[in-house]
Amino acid sequence: MKQVYLDNNATTRLDPMVLEAMMPFLTDFYGNPSSIHDFGIPAQAALERAHQQAAALLGAEYPSEIIFTSWPRATPRHAAIALLPERREIITSVVEHPATLAACEHLERQGYRIHRIAVDSEGALDMAQFRAALSPRVALVSVMWANNETGVLFPIGEMAELAHEQGALFHCDAVQVVGKIPIAVGQTRIDMLSCSAHKFHGPKGVGCLYLRRGTRFRPLLRGGHQEYGRRAGTENICGIVGMGAACELANIHLPGMTHIGQLRNRLEHRLLASVPSVMVMGGGQPRVPGTVNLAFEFIEGEAILLLLNQAGIAASSGSACTSGSLEPSHVMRAMNIPYTAAHGTIRFSLSRYTREKEIDYVVATLPPIIDRLRALSPYWQNGKPRPADAVFTPVYG
């Protein structure tokens, strides 16, 4: 059976060249990078090179601004701990990754006031609400650069400038943009930026935090000098080497993301032409090249995914961290997508390994699946939606 992987926002395949770079550090170069003998020296050299590779991809001015970690989305807690006690407010958005939302809820229980900025039906951030929430009481702004479900990009540069006008730190969750669009963090007012290697063909379990030189910071993990004293614990050299290699390869392949955008558009346009009652989530906004979220009205996204999987196609109904729930995702609810559409959202996310013939296979396979499921739907009759008064339409609670 043909296999097509279009769930790259959840994770990506490991690049063979990344694996090749990692292997010696699983077998031969097993020394501790903190050791000064001949076993530790190659590990330390590899660690320094990985800092340089990550800094180059992110556009950081100094390799020492990179902190390798297994938990890049811990940044809101890092930043809040570092700030002055009189600043007790944090700004985020309603469509952040569940890990960020959970961190903000934890801080809220500790007495912080959390401003959650709304989005419109296209997934665009309410900038008027954002400006109104800013004040000298705000310690931190923590928002994603691109939404993991829709691919919609936020105006990060403008937001960082506005945050600095009020003396707030600015953190950007860049997990879904690194390796997909050019980043020059050193030319922005971003104080902190987090990313994860497995989203751009690196290994799982390793990420990094960009921390602008001079930014206040107090580590959550203490007890060691590693990562310039900012992340205690013996370094995961194998994983870090893999992330460094993935960063270098991502830099090389960045120009090819234009082609990925063209493939995304091919998938999007052909499905819109062949399937009725389908909407593109955030289609009117700037998006990362490889993400498209389609809402197939009047059917369940989980059913679509199961039938796609039987045809060898891997996609997602939203964030991998929330899949398994039958409720529409918090992102769809925040965008106020109609219930009958929000339940039928499918996210296709491409990578540099995606080929045109795979896109064409999806375009040929999906419409019959939609027809089959709609034939069973109480909301669909004779090839079109049933009258609104003929069925019960649930609403969000």
Curated annotation (Swiss-Prot):
Tell me one Pfam family matched here: Aminotran_5
An individual GO BP term = nitrogen fixation
SUPFAM superfamilies in the record, alphabetically?
Answer: PLP-dependent transferases
Q: What does this protein do?
A: Catalyzes the removal of elemental sulfur atoms from cysteine to produce alanine. Seems to participate in the biosynthesis of the nitrogenase metalloclusters by providing the inorganic sulfur required for the Fe-S core formation.
Family, similarity comment: Belongs to the class-V pyridoxal-phosphate-dependent aminotransferase family. NifS/IscS subfamily.
List the NCBIfam families: FeS_nifS (TIGR03402)
Protein name stated in the entry: Cysteine desulfurase
- Species of the source: Klebsiella pneumoniae
Organism taxonomic ancestry:
Bacteria, Pseudomonadati, Pseudomonadota, Gammaproteobacteria, Enterobacterales
Q: Which gene encodes it?
A: nifS
